[in-house]
Amino acid sequence: MIQVENLSFSYQNNKVFKNLSFSIKKGEYLCIIGKNGSGKSTLAKLLAGLIFKQEGSIKISGYDTKNQKDLLEIRKLVGIIFQNPENQIINTTVFDEVVFGLENLATPRENIKEIAENSLKSVALLEYKDRLTYQLSGGEKQRLAIASVLAMGTEILIFDEAISMLDPVGKKEVLKLMKELNSQGKTIIHITHNRNDILEASEVMVLSNGEIKYQGNPYKIFEDDEFNPFLIKIKNILEKNNIKIDDKNINMEDLVRLVYENIS
């Protein structure tokens, strides 16, 4: 469904990606994880067709993001939910929020009510359809943003740090919904910096400095020392101080003190 080949992208003369290649199958639940600045959000926008001045190719169900005509189809197929739902919804009723997007797509008027209600039902918000959007909780606002995306006929949903600002209840609600949508055949791409978010995914991609360090089983992230953030910090401290762990002349007390002073 998604094929990325030799993707390179620069922002303000800084190389974000260089020759990135990967594929995402239809109906997959992929979690993309990485530190701030690793290129996760840029990749999300590229996949959604919001940025398209790149080298290499991105094809979504055969549509090419570099083709202006194809971009219109891609933006119907791919929906993106951002970190702050306040930036995606307007101050109106829950029902009218979904209707607004459908009207912009020139959806036949006789179909709008049914599509909007079905979308709200799919995210358990139909009973709130007459409520004003500002009265919703954070989790409910994200579910409304998802409903608006689903109403467009979206097959691929990208969640760009979409649960990072929610309270525990809201996070649980949205994660459950993501899993349900995936079980219905939707392709889910969940972008996060929190390793605990990846366990529901069928596959995980680790991004670091614009490169794919790993793509595969999410449980490897917890098992492999290469992805242990504590061990990575220690390794960076040693490298910064030109210390090799197999050096027989290392004073262990000095080493422990050095790590303790720099590990925060």
UniProtKB/Swiss-Prot annotation:
The species is: Fusobacterium nucleatum subsp. nucleatum (strain ATCC 25586 / DSM 15643 / BCRC 10681 / CIP 101130 / JCM 8532 / KCTC 2640 / LMG 13131 / VPI 4355)
State the encoding gene.
Answer: ecfA1
Q: Which residues bind ATP?
A: 34-41
Q: Which GO terms describe its cellular component?
A: plasma membrane
Q: Name one GO biological process term.
A: transmembrane transport
GO terms (molecular function) for this protein are: ATP binding; ATP hydrolysis activity
Q: Does the keyword ATP-binding apply?
A: yes
Where in or outside the cell it occurs: the entry states:
Cell inner membrane
Task: State the family it belongs to.
Answer: Belongs to the ABC transporter superfamily. Energy-coupling factor EcfA family.
Q: Which PROSITE patterns does this UniProt record tie to the protein? A: ABC_TRANSPORTER_1 (PS00211), ABC_TRANSPORTER_2 (PS50893), CBIO (PS51246)
**What is the name attached to this protein's record?**
Energy-coupling factor transporter ATP-binding protein EcfA1
Subunit annotation: Forms a stable energy-coupling factor (ECF) transporter complex composed of 2 membrane-embedded substrate-binding proteins (S component), 2 ATP-binding proteins (A component) and 2 transmembrane proteins (T component).
Q: Tell me which CDD domains the record gives.
A: ABC_cobalt_CbiO_domain1 (cd03225)
